[in-house]
From Swiss-Prot:
It catalyses: ATP + H2O + 4 H(+)(in) = ADP + phosphate + 5 H(+)(out). GO terms for biological process: proton motive force-driven mitochondrial ATP synthesis. The lineage of its organism: Eukaryota, Viridiplantae, Streptophyta, Embryophyta, Tracheophyta. This is ATP synthase subunit beta, mitochondrial. Belongs to the ATPase alpha/beta chains family. GO terms for cellular component: mitochondrial inner membrane; proton-transporting ATP synthase complex.
Amino acid sequence: MASRRVVSSLLRSASRLRAASPAAPRPRAPPHRPSPAGYLFNRAAAYASSAAAQAAPATPPPATGKTGGGKITDEFTGAGAIGQVCQVIGAVVDVRFDEGLPPILTALEVLDNNIRLVLEVAQHLGENMVRTIAMDGTEGLVRGQRVLNTGSPITVPVGRATLGRIINVIGEPIDEKGDIKTNHFLPIHREAPAFVEQATEQQILVTGIKVVDLLAPYQRGGKIGLFGGAGVGKTVLIMELINNVAKAHGGFSVFAGVGERTREGNDLYREMIESGVIKLDDKQSESKCALVYGQMNEPPGARARVGLTGLTVAEHFRDAEGQDVLLFIDNIFRFTQANSEVSALLGRIPSAVGYQPTLATDLGGLQERITTTKKGSITSVQAIYVPADDLTDPAPATTFAHLDATTVLSRQISELGIYPAVDPLDSTSRMLSPHVLGEDHYNTARGVQKVLQNYKNLQDIIAILGMDELSEDDKLTVARARKIQRFLSQPFHVAEVFTGAPGKYVELKESVKSFQGVLDGKYDDLPEQSFYMVGGIEEVIAKAEKIAKESAS
């Protein structure tokens, strides 16, 4: 009983003490400190959600009924707006507009200038400033000068009025033959044809050049690349192709000179006049070729866009007139080089080997427009300069992916005095198939390549041991290979003024028959020098007889 009273009194005293004293604070949990990455992620997520909540429209915008997909369309705005030049750094010009920025790729024209200076919008800087690339020299340009928004991309004249004429990147004639009188104009920035509009057909374009037609034939409506270093004959080969195709097929050609020598452009123009490809004065409408020049003395903006100008002229002949057009680009590497300069001027960080990060995109935008549609075709032959003869350089390597045939010009072959200096083993074509060419042509081409490859394999043995150590079969292989090597040479029409030898156009059937005869050993008794710089096999026989008479006398 006494113990129970003691316990109850202790409980009562404890309760009084608890009521009188303040509540003891609970022990705090250690503060949660998120990691820096988690903190930044949480802040970014909160900001994005709040920004999205503020920017979300109450109702969806009305449909416009046009499906541009954010690509190049005709919906350019702000035509007639006036801006002011606020900064000039070489070929880069910054222009301020008080209201409404012109879209990317819009053409602007500088007012009150001594020449027509076109600027193309490349970047938007802030809310009222654009950075542009000049299509001509910016000498004499001053801050505050007025600039007009044309409301469209660079637009150039197209159609038959351009035949026999030379125009620049913005469509101005530069041949001193007056204005180009036409009602047809097109923007140089256009979408590639849709898949449903494209057509694929396997047909050879006969060039009349033996080594090309036999070993790496060109596809009508395809893309062909001429690879080679400096001075191995790319431009001469292109000039011969223009000459042969104009005479043999009668089709229209467009030549785009991109960043090459002005002297060569002038020589090409004179050659075309002399050969009748271009006619002057009253007969100009009978011309077969249009020339578009943006040579190496032009600013990078002009060189980066002149290829598109030439392509636009060719597209009109294909789409509006249903023509099979030949588009020659000399040199597609200069197109890449100019875009690299523009990229550096715009402050983009360079990619591999100093090229622009958008190398594949720039090239693809041009190449995808060169195609065959159900209306007509564009067959493109592109000279491709190979820096330091390195085919793994990003510029030529990226171009390879777009090509249907490659014609590789070799310095080793040119050093032997064999022109055109086409490498018969490195040059390739998707057309080299028995289903396309037929069994005779295919077997002859492969037979020629096999003999040349065997000769190449034997050259080390010959250099070390000499010809006497070879077997009889190997000696025969070497003799035939040397004849084939020389027989692949050919005098060109456009080189007559330099060599004095008349040019030769060799039909495809004759080429196949002649080389098959060499492989079969029909001409083993003829000296190898009789195969050098001739056309068909009849000329070889005639030259051999002439050599025999000279040696006998």
